[in-house]
Design a protein with these regions (language model features):
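A glycosyltransferase accessory/donor-loop signature
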Residues: 1-22, 28-29, 39-40, 46, ...
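Short, solvent-exposed loop/edge-beta patches enriched in aromatic
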Residues: 10-11, 36-41, 103-111
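GT-A fold catalytic core of metal-dependent nucleotide-sugar glycosyltransferases
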Residues: 95-145, 170
Length: 266
């Protein structure tokens, strides 16, 4: 087990962030917050779909349209649908997140995060505290069922079991639970198989405290978030598709906006 401040037989702790060019600022805020709070060296890399397609790690097919929603205002808002299972998805990283064990060479620990988040605490705490080798991964095991029918970019909201478990995943990349899991699975398995983590036994999935994936509009307001997740959209969608539903949501939104201002002033 890793001891505090001991990474002698591991790479520098690494975070892979789901990247969508429409949310570049969100990615940059997350990266900025990670480095701002980190107590030591840390890598933060975006998972860019165009790059991983180019090197042959990803070939999942998708199509535009087929939505029963009103016509969107621009092409960027047209519903994306997966050609394998016909289900809607909303971002470039809906499935590419599941490549993290392979991107990390099937060894050591690596963290995946959606881009619509920001740290309020030291991200290295995750690597120091949650590294029991009996687990193939850790996540916050949310019981989350959104009430909205439409999400960002006018896409349909789709509910499924274990929703938001896959938005923060700390992978033990060399764990035996991944031995039958392949790069090809990421391009060919149904989205529900991937997001429900069905290549793993339930006992292989460790639990992170909810403050590491605090969901706006859902998580307890009195829980002091270490990582805030704007799963309903975020302050960069103010006056479009997102608004706070609690004082805590607004407080965290203002913190995010302050980080965005810091980036713009650099």
């Amino acid at each position: 087990m890793i001891q505090p401040n001991d990474y002698s037989h591991f790479d520098i702790p690494t975070i892979y962030v789901g990247y969508d060019p429409r949310e570049d600022l969100a990615y940059r805020v997350l990266k900025h917050s990670a480095h701002k709070h980190a107590s030591g060296p840390l890598n933060v890399f975006p998972i860019r779909q165009d790059n991983i397609r180019r090197i042959g790690l990803y070939r999942r097919a998708w199509e535009l349209g087929s939505s029963n929603l009103p016509k969107p205002e621009n092409d960027a808002d047209i519903q994306h649908r997966d050609q394998f299972d016909g289900r809607p998805f909303s971002t470039d990283f809906s499935f590419t997140r599941f490549l993290v064990p392979f991107l990390h060479r099937l060894e050591g620990w690596a963290l995946f995060m959606d881009c619509d988040m920001f740290f309020r605490s030291d991200p290295l705490e995750l690597f120091r505290k949650y590294n029991d080798d009996k687990y193939a991964m850790y996540c916050v095991k949310h019981n989350y069922h959104p009430t909205e029918t439409i999400k960002m970019y006018g896409n349909e909201q789709y509910d499924y079991s274990r929703k938001n478990w896959s938005s923060v995943m700390l992978f033990n990349c060399g764990h035996h639970g991944h031995k039958n899991y392949t790069v090809d699975d990421v391009s060919t398995k149904p989205g529900r198989w991937l997001h429900n983590l069905l290549w793993l036994e339930d006992a292989d999935i460790g639990r992170l405290p909810e403050e590491w994936n605090w969901l706006d509009g859902h998580s307890p307001a009195d829980l002091d978030a270490k990582n805030v997740h704007f799963t309903r959209g975020g302050p960069w969608f103010r006056h479009l598709s997102w608004s706070p539903v609690s004082d805590q949501d607004e407080m965290y939104a203002q913190e995010w906006e302050n980080l965005a201002t810091e980036i713009k002033q650099q």
